[in-house]
């Protein structure tokens, strides 16, 4: 089904691979207004609705002997709770930040995984707006954590570490300021964006090539069209890899958000 929905428009039988225009689909509703909605926006709405439905169905009738759906949901929640939140923040601080870190993980996962779902075929996190919003949420969380514990001394202590020689303070302060308050959110957003863009481009390339080989080259009687078997096999394998990447990037994003909170709460501040 990915093959059927690959972007394979051709001109005079030529092959056209993926392009950045995939990430700027035409408006569907409210064109030309601040509320313009395109295909990617609809995918994001769909992901939010599906996530809410999954958690509502999974928690409305909890049973002592759990169903398979309840087991799967509990496994996912316990994975995030133990392997990201508790292992990074500990029990006390973990309880305080459990909800936002879990929300970040499942939201990023849901947005990422649409890139391999037939007829959606593009990640909701593959344009810069959403990664920026998620990075800003993480930014607010770790700054809030630092201010909550240390007051506004948090900013001073973050850019002026203790024990630094006086002559090195200006250089160290600039480095710490940039790395803590600028590079953290920027790298969070760009890491997620670049992984999703690259994955989409490779998948579309594989399945576009497959359709071209089968329905253009082979249909004309040229047996070079059998190369489509190889591109299809590579696309199928890469689809599984993209599933792994979708989960991994959700884990990395949530883990780094928790790590930045932990650094803000560290006693050195």
Enumerate the predicted regions with their spans:
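Selective transmembrane helix interface/packing segments
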Residues: 2-269
